[in-house]
Amino acid sequence: MYRVNEIFYSLQGEGANTGTPAVFVRFSGCNLSCFFCDTDFSSYTEMSVEDIVSAVSAYPARLVVLTGGEPSLQVDRKLVDALHAVNKYLAIETNGTRPLPEGIDFVTISPKETGKIILQEADEVKVVYIGQDVERYTAWISAPRYFLQPCSEVKNGVQTDNREEVIRYILNHPHWRLSLQTHKILNIR
């Protein structure tokens, strides 16, 4: 059984697949504790492979985004094979601290300050920028695309982020690209 926080249908809001219709399977639980995490781990539903495949198949999109939390704590070859059997294209958003099962079609590593990265290759690297040394990620992880994402916080009831700082960094380091959380800008899931 898998602990699933939610399954929903929307547009991918981040990275290279921004704007692509996708079914999101958000797994509960994580091996890290990041202050900017937007996932509620307190509630989840236990689901079988068949339950997940059925829920995902209710939507027309081929892209399925396995996210969390940290999906590598739960995603296994059995689930990957079952989703491929119904012609789904699987993307995973991982912190890169755990091995992934074979068969994932698109890997996004979103490294965190508190975890030791073991994955060395990805389709993209997406870093939430909090002023840290991000160049080390380009040395540690081979990927065709590297994205910086502003860190959003709510202070005194007002949403703020470090967007200007991120833009300055990218302009000075043009191998990085900007990734905004467009789903939040558009006020969609």
Task: For each feature predicted by the language model, list its residue ranges.
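Conserved AdoMet/S-adenosylmethionine-binding subsite of the radical SAM
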Residues: 72-189
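A short beta-strand-turn-helix
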Residues: 10-15
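Conserved Radical SAM active-site core
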Residues: 2-9, 21-24, 33-104
